[in-house]
Amino acid sequence: YGRGVSRSVPMGDVVEQIAKLVDRGHKEAVLTGVDLTSYGPDLPGKPKLGQLVKAILKHVPDLQRLRLSSIDSVEADEELTEAIATEDRLMPHLHLSLQSGDDLILKRMKRRHLRDDAIRICRDLKKARPELVFGADLIAGFPTESDEAFENSLRLVDECGLSFLHVFPYSPRVGTPAAKMPQVKSDVIKSRAKRLREKGDEVLSAHLTKLVGTIQDVLVERGGLARTKCFTSVHVGDHFEAGSFATVKIAAHDGKRLTI
């Protein structure tokens, strides 16, 4: 709503831009877009996202880390799935645009996947690349969402093995079909969002706990923070220069990030 028609940047232009960034010392690139897995149908030859990923990794050999932003899991093409499973420089973290774990709500959202699709893709990718970590967007209180539908979303967190949640309480936008549907009461929306966030805290803590005691290669950012390959935040203080790589041993976590 209000976004207009998707426009894809030609593959050659993307490769060229990333190559220039690497020449200037950048070590990681992130592919982003409103609907990243819809890349390519407006370009000659209609390349898909998987082809773009492979082209970047092939033609920019000095790029050390490539990430994908939020993707629609069911739209992941075969080459992209293969790259996720086999390309070490494609980081083992995917943020999925799931939105709900209930089929009826997904249909009313006009999503392109159903609940079982999300579970299947997470299961298959995790089997192909065990270190893969998933995050997801979930909306609480979409119009007509029943208690049962909400519980389906809550269960999806474990069934997909999610470690990071972005939870959004639904708010109507004038002119959209959803705004004309029967609305969930605001106090119910707040309560459901709170429960989803609590679930997010739970699975994040479990993910962080698994990493305590491990050795991690991190890319240092500003503010004394760094990121593991699986996008987990690590507090490294002022021990390392921003933009550098470091190998650190994880000592603990504070529920939100790792510490050394």
What are these regions (language model features)?
Residues 1-15:
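Canonical Radical SAM [4Fe-4S] cluster-binding loop centered on the CxxxCxxC motif
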Residues 14, 31, 68, 96, ...:
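Conserved, mostly hydrophobic/aromatic
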Residues 14-18, 81, 147-155:
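Short, acidic/polar
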Residues 22-23, 158:
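Non-catalytic positions within long, well-ordered alpha-helices that form the structural scaffold/packing
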Residues 23-147:
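Conserved SAM/AdoMet-binding glycine-rich loop
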Residues 40-58, 109-112, 172-202:
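Radical SAM enzyme [4Fe-4S]-AdoMet core and its adjacent flexible, acidic
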Residues 128, 148-193:
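C-terminal, non-catalytic macromolecule-binding modules
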Residues 172, 180-260:
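Terminal RNA-binding accessory module
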